[in-house]
């Protein structure tokens, strides 16, 4: 409705959608055209082969007009709200080449103290290491592996070896780039990523993330 800028979204600003209005059918549809397609396999998470598409109308982060509008939105949002950082959601579904350059340019404009972290929901140690390399460690990541360890410890009880609680975690491998947490909105009961840390273990879990040396 052009309330904040004059940009108009058109079909070519997207690379996929989940509904064919002409045939009234739901599905995952790849939008075809010049320079269209999903992000390259090595730029998004490899779950399901290529996890560029998540839901609804999927932005094409290769399109120059999309890139320009996101940059303008970032400038407007920071200026309007005065925020001093971003939490980037679901970054494993976004072209990592775009993310690397976007955060680089945001920090060049806002200052290196502008804090950014991303929700890269992947508990695999190697995948996290690789992603940090791809984005040149320009922003931090939530420590999903540590959360999974906390969840497993809380459900296993006395059978869990606490000496392994930090194994394979970001906080062990890249402590300066790890954002630790116990639970969040995605891990609570009934959610797709349900992995709730049991209540009896939460005091110990918070002690582990808040009192750690690194």
Across the structure, where does each feature detected by a protein language model lie?
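Active-site-proximal helices and loops of the catalytic beta/alpha 8
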Residues: 1-16, 20, 72-214
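Core domains of carbohydrate- and sulfate-ester-processing enzymes
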Residues: 2-52
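Active-site-adjacent "subsite" loops/lids of carbohydrate-active enzymes
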Residues: 32-80, 91
């Amino acid at each position: 409705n052009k309330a904040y800028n004059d940009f108009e979204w058109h079909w070519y600003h997207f690379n996929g959608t989940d509904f064919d209005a002409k045939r009234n059918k739901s599905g995952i549809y790849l939008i075809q055209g010049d320079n269209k397609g999903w992000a390259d396999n090595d730029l998004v998470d490899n779950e399901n082969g290529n996890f560029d598409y998540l839901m609804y109308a999927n932005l094409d982060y290769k399109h120059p007009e999309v890139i320009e509008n996101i940059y303008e939105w970032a400038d407007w949002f920071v200026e309007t709200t005065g925020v001093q950082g971003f939490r980037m959601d679901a970054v494993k579904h976004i072209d990592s080449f775009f993310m690397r350059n976007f955060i680089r340019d945001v920090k060049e404009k806002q200052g290196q103290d502008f804090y950014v972290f991303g929700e890269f929901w992947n508990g695999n140690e190697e995948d996290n290491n690789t992603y940090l390399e791809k984005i040149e460690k320009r922003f931090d990541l939530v420590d999903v592996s540590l959360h999974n360890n906390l969840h497993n410890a809380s459900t296993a009880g006395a059978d869990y070896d606490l000496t392994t609680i930090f194994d394979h975690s970001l906080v062990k491998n890249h402590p300066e780039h790890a954002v630790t947490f116990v639970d969040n909105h995605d891990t609570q009961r009934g959610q797709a990523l349900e992995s709730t840390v049991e209540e009896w273990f939460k005091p110990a879990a918070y002690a582990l993330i808040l009192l750690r040396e690194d």
